[in-house]
Amino acid sequence: MTRYTEGNVALLPALAADLVRLNVDLIVVGGVRYVGVLAAKQATTTIPIVMESLATDPVAAGLVESLARPGGNITGFTIMTIEMAGKRLELFKAAVPTLGRVAVLSAAANPGNVLHAHAVQTAGQALGVTVQLWGVRGTEDFERVFAALRAERPDGLYMPGGPLTGTNEKRIVDFAVTSGFPLVRDSREAVEAGAFMSYAYDIVDQSRRLASYVDRILQGAKPADLPIQQPMKFELIINLKTAQALGLTIPPTLLFQADEVIR
């Protein structure tokens, strides 16, 4: 059985309570935000909870005792999206050697997005790239930010994932392409939609590992004893069609490194 918030996180406590009432054998919490896991944790201390793709440090968030031995009834997977911010920006710079200014477009009300944006800014200092932070507070705020970016003309855009940016994915990608901005994301779907490049965890590999954990728990393993795991495989995906539309020539060495090139 499945329960969805339809984008309304206020529904999470009721949805978690409903699953507990139904006495399910296990709860898998999807999505990158910790609030879903927190709602499940507050609803039950006995039903096993498996995190699918948490973007927050679960120890710092108070969800588990440690990565090696979570304790309690929660285990699962993180996606290291913030930790990979520097590598993502480094690859962006390798793809566009003239990259001097990057605008990070993120959800201002999303704590994970804010941390992610600051991680990109820190990485930029080491790479000689000026990183400008642009916070979007809601869907109605995009046009204001788009107009400002057209005036500022950064060399590229970087967008962390999240509910707000994900819901407006096509709108943002279309803006980037029509305005002449290469856009770097942390999801395959964004590049397939027309974004310039993505460097992110391999979702297929992560899903297989998630299924293995679910099976082990249903066979009797305790979540407290199963370490929190991080991604083992990452994918570099480049949209060559978008690069050509933007007039960019990707260095052959980087194309060779790519796991997938969309032509």
What is each stretch, according to the model?
Residues M1-R263:
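Short hydrophobic alpha-helices and adjacent helix-cap/hinge residues
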